[in-house]
């Protein structure tokens, strides 16, 4: 009798562990998304409550930073390789940081149900929390001769992040919300490169680009997937319609 009870308890333990392993990614991602939503709410409230003069100063400082990048020559490095922060990091981290905590704003990719805060930098710690803006690229406020780069991990067991970026197609839409401004980008180019081939992320004169970057292939991570969007007119209808479509391609309705 005791042996039967022991075997039964062992089966229950094994089943419990198995169920835990199966459910962990779903539960973990649910908790991650709740936390991300809370941060996004804080960012939106901060932008809504911002003093007009302070807001103007922040935007002008970001525009100045972007103008200097457009006229200079920056050598971009793989965002998924840890680099020692340079002397400009302090100034960079102070820009678009009204909500504190290093959050610039947030990105929405309705086609793949992604909504993530955008942090300054691409350190390992940052990319565990959400999307990271690649230092050395234009700040995500748009404008002529700008090219922002937003990075995110693929394949984390604790959160989805940019795992489904491979599902995007040319013509799909994504949206940036920064300092109360809303920017829309339509995917116009998708490419796969080696980590050292960062020249595709450079600024093009007169263009307003934002590129999303993640590792690929899934679980191997030897290459980088680049999903570039070109700025297009933002309307509330575009974002709302894209949100209704969910995982179906945004192209047919937006």
Positions of PLM-derived features:
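Conserved small/polar residues in nucleotide/adenosyl-binding loops
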Residues: 248-254
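Solvent-exposed, non-transmembrane regions of membrane-associated and secreted proteins
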Residues: 4-247
């Amino acid at each position: 009798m005791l042996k039967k009870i022991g075997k039964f308890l062992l089966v229950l333990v094994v089943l419990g562990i198995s169920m835990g392993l199966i459910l962990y990614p779903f539960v973990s991602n649910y908790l991650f998304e709740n936390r991300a939503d809370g941060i996004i709410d804080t960012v939106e409230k901060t932008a809504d409550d911002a003093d007009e003069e302070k807001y103007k100063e922040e935007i002008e400082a970001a525009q100045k930073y972007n103008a200097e990048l457009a006229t200079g020559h920056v050598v971009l490095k793989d965002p998924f390789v840890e680099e020692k922060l340079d002397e400009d990091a302090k100034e960079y981290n102070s820009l678009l940081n009204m909500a504190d905590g290093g959050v610039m704003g947030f990105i929405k990719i309705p086609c793949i149900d992604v909504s993530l805060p955008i942090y300054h930098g691409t350190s390992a710690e940052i990319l565990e929390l959400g999307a990271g803006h690649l230092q050395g690229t234009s700040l995500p406020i748009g404008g002529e001769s700008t090219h922002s780069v937003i990075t995110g991990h693929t394949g984390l067991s604790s959160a989805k992040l940019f795992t489904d970026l491979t599902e995007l197609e040319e013509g799909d839409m994504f949206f940036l919300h920064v300092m109360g401004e809303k920017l829309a980008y339509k995917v116009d180019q998708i490419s796969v490169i080696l980590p050292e081939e960062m020249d595709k992320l450079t600024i093009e004169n007169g263009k307003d680009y934002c590129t999303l970057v993640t590792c690929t292939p899934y679980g191997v991570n030897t290459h980088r997937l680049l999903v570039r969007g070109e700025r297009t007119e933002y309307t509330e209808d575009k974002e709302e319609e894209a949100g209704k479509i969910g995982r179906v391609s945004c192209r047919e309705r937006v």
